[in-house]
C-alpha cells in the first residue's frame, strides 16, 4: 500500500448493455482506493445525451460500498450540484466541462449551498479580470506560448 490516498474515476460501463459500475466500484474498493468518482455516462456515449445518475445512486446506496462516492456529469449549475447531493446521495461532485469558460461556478455553488441564494453571473468586466488572472497563472504554470494557446479554449467559452 502507498502512503498517499489513491482515488479513481470511471464511467458506468462500456455501453448501455454493459452498465457494470457496481461491480467496478466493489473491485476498486477491494484493491484499496479511498474514493471513487463516477461519470454518469458509458464509454460509448462519450459526452452525448444526459448523464444517468441512477446507477451512481445505486453504488452510493450499496451496503458493501464504504468509500466516498463522487458524482460527475452535467453539473452545470448550483441547483444541479445540490440535486446530486439531495436526490442521489453522493458524498461530493466533480465538475469538468462546466468549468471551461465559467470557473466561477465553484463560488456560485458554495454560495448557493451556504445561503440558498443564486449568485448572478459575472459582469463582462469581472469576466475580463478572471481571464487576466487565468492567463497569468497559465503562463506561469506552463510557458508563454503554450499557456496562451491553452487559454484560448477557455476565453472563447466565456462570452
Predicted regions and their residues:
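Glycine-rich, proline-tolerant flexible connector loops at the mouths of alpha/beta enzymes
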Residues: 38-48
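Alpha/beta catalytic cores of nucleotide-metabolism and tRNA/nucleoside-modifying enzymes
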Residues: 3, 17-35, 47, 54, ...
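Conserved anion-binding
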Residues: 3-16, 42-43
